[in-house]
Amino acid sequence: MSTKPDMIQKCLWLEILMGIFIAGTLSLDCNLLNVHLRRVTWQNLRHLSSMSNSFPVECLRENIAFELPQEFLQYTQPMKRDIKKAFYEMSLQAFNIFSQHTFKYWKERHLKQIQIGLDQQAEYLNQCLEEDKNENEDMKEMKENEMKPSEARVPQLSSLELRRYFHRIDNFLKEKKYSDCAWEIVRVEIRRCLYYFYKFTALFRRK
C-alpha cells in the first residue's frame, strides 16, 4: 500500500536532483548568467503562483506595504554589476525567508524547487561576482578617472535597502507568529519582488 507514496517521493527527489544538475552545469560559464537568472526567476514566479490556489479574502485586513525600494521600481538602466549584486542579495534573503517555518499547506514540491533555485542562483552569482572583481580590479582606477560627472551621480541598486526590505518581511512573519495569513501575504509580496527582478533580466540581456 505504501508503494505509491514511495514512488511519488522518489520522483520528487529525482526532479530536484535534475534541477541541481542543470544549475550546476550552467554555473560553469558566467556568460550564461542571464540565461540562468531569467529561467530560474520565471520558474520561481510560476512556483509561487502554484503554491496556493488563491489569496484568502480573510487575510486582506492583515496586508501591509513592505516598501520595495523605489530604486528597484524605477531603475531602467542599471549596470551589469549592479544587477548581479542585487540578484545575489535577493537570492540570499529570499532563501532565508523560505527556509523558516513555512506555511504547512504549501505544496512541498514547489517550495523545494524555489529553495534549490535560490540557493544555486546565489552560488552562481557569487562565482560571477568574484570573476568580475578579479577581471576589473586593474581597470577600476582608470574607469573612475574617465567617468563623466553626470555618470558619477547615477544611483546604484542598493543591497542595504534590499536587506532592509527583507528584514521588514522577516519581522512581519515573526510578529504574526508565522500565521497562515502572514505566509500568504509574504508569498504574494515576494512574487511581486521577483517580477521586477525578472524585468531586470531583459535589461541585462541588452547590455
Curated annotation (Swiss-Prot):
Keyword Secreted: yes
A GO CC term attached to the entry: extracellular region
Tissue spec. comment: Expressed in keratinocytes, monocytes and in resting dendritic cells.
Main localization, broad class: secreted
Keywords: Antiviral defense, Coiled coil, Cytokine, Disulfide bond, Secreted, Signal
Coiled coil: 118-148
Induction details: By viral infection, upon exposure to double-stranded RNA, or upon treatment with either interferon-gamma or interferon-beta.
Subcellular location: Secreted
GO biological process: adaptive immune response; B cell activation involved in immune response; cellular response to virus; cytokine-mediated signaling pathway; defense response to virus; humoral immune response; natural killer cell activation; natural killer cell activation involved in immune response
Family as reported in the entry's similarity comment: Belongs to the alpha/beta interferon family.
Name the UniProt record assigns to this protein: Interferon kappa
Source organism of this protein record: Homo sapiens
